[in-house]
């Protein structure tokens, strides 16, 4: 990714990482990810955030091109997570006269990552919520966004060009060079949000309220494309996601965790029964689908059916993983149907119900499906009852 001209004074100097396979060592990123960084050229020059160590050389090349013969006066640190803050100490050493801008928590974490001497105290500009920094004709106002998704996070608003530098907010998986503006922004933005930030809905809601008071024409996130044009659609997505409301209230996810295929076959039969009743259904085999995609679809749908085999008296691990992730991400406000399978002692429904009881505003259907080895007429009758109940809710 080369230097990106956002305006005459604002440049993107981020880097696409197309060789990474797992973001945060857990989330598949088949089209890579971008680490975004920005430069504002004015009477004074500000760099906004650094990049991951994986992209240091390419980023420094972009930065050198963008700066020309200018020296930066400031490095603004929005977020200390290593995919954005890894090169702070390196940049501070490269430009010894540069000040580093952050809040009190920023510098606590900076010392934890790099030691107390990486950025001397006299080089630190410690800002408070709502304070501003003038660069000349451009002014950055700092808006604290704690727990979106780390405690020190802050976003920056540049008033003359109406640009919000949004930290991880409005980020998206995928290399920028591979993003087609006509493509579906929401798909990988949704997966990014729900798996990275999803736990912190109330904090995102608080940030959205602060942002509503700003006149924003451009959003510059730390991952993914710069957003312009009709920003309302992006804000609407974030409002829905952070409110834990389903995008498609009547859509039903049927997710199965099957050892030898019998539970999966029963789940498919259930899905077909739901479709016959006019429901919109998506099926997921948890043994063949990364959990991040299942989490995303569970949040997108208003209703889910979980079909799981009993395994050593517990849940088959792929289902256990999904429920753990959902609980971690504060999954709530949904209707859930349960299907279990066990040749001699089916326990999965009881165990899944117990997991769901720890989540907020989850309605578990009264009708359950119990399969002993393979579905038969009795199990199909139970499926019919569950299908009737969940479609009616």
Task: Report residues per predicted region.
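Conserved beta-strand hairpin/beta-sheet module of binuclear metal-dependent hydrolase folds
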Residues: 3-65, 155-158, 162-165, 263
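Metallo-beta-lactamase
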Residues: 4-8, 101-153, 200-206
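Active-site metal-binding motif and surrounding structural segment of the metallo-beta-lactamase
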Residues: 43, 54-101
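Active-site neighborhood of phospho(di)ester-bond hydrolases with catalytic His/Asp-centered motifs
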Residues: 48-50, 72-80, 99-103, 164-168, ...
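Short acidic active-site motifs
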Residues: 87, 290-294
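Short N-terminal or domain-adjacent regulatory/targeting segments
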Residues: 220-248
């Amino acid at each position: 990714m080369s230097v990106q001209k956002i305006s005459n004074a604002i440049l993107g100097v981020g880097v696409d990482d197309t060789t990474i396979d797992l973001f945060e060592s857990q989330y598949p990123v088949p089209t890579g990810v971008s680490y975004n960084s920005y430069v504002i050229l004015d009477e004074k020059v500000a760099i906004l955030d650094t990049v991951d160590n994986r992209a240091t050389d390419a980023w420094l090349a972009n930065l050198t091109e963008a700066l020309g013969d200018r020296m930066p006066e400031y490095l603004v640190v929005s977020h200390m997570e290593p995919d954005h803050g890894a090169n702070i100490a390196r940049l501070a050493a490269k430009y010894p006269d540069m000040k580093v801008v952050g809040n009190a928590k920023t510098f606590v974490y900076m010392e934890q990552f790099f030691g107390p001497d990486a950025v001397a105290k006299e080089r630190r500009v410690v800002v408070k919520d709502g304070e501003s920094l003038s660069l000349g004709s451009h002014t950055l106002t700092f808006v604290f966004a704690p727990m979106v998704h780390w405690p020190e996070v802050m976003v920056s608003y540049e008033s003359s060009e109406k640009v919000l530098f949004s930290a991880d907010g409005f980020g998206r998986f995928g290399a920028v060079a591979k993003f087609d503006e006509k493509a579906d922004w929401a798909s990988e933005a949704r997966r990014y949000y729900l798996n990275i930030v999803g736990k912190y809905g109330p904090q995102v809601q608080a940030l959205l309220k602060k942002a509503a008071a700003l006149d924003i024409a451009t959003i510059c996130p730390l991952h993914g494309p710069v957003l312009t044009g009709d920003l309302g659609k992006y804000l609407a997505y974030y409002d829905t996601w952070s409110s834990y409301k389903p995008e498609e209230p009547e859509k039903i996810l049927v997710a199965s965790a099957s050892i030898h295929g019998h539970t999966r076959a029963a789940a498919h039969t259930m899905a077909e029964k739901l479709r016959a009743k006019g429901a919109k259904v998506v099926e997921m085999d948890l043994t063949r689908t990364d959990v991040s995609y299942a989490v995303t679809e569970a949040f997108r749908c208003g209703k889910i059916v979980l079909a799981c085999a009993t395994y050593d008296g517990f849940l088959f691990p792929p289902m256990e993983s999904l429920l753990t992730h959902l609980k971690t991400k504060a999954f709530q406000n949904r209707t859930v149907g349960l299907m279990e399978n066990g040749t001699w002692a089916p326990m999965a429904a009881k165990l899944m119900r117990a997991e769901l009881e720890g989540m907020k505003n989850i309605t578990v259907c009264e009708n359950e499906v119990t399969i002993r080895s393979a579905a038969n007429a009795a199990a199909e009758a139970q499926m019919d009852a569950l299908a009737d109940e969940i479609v009616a809710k």
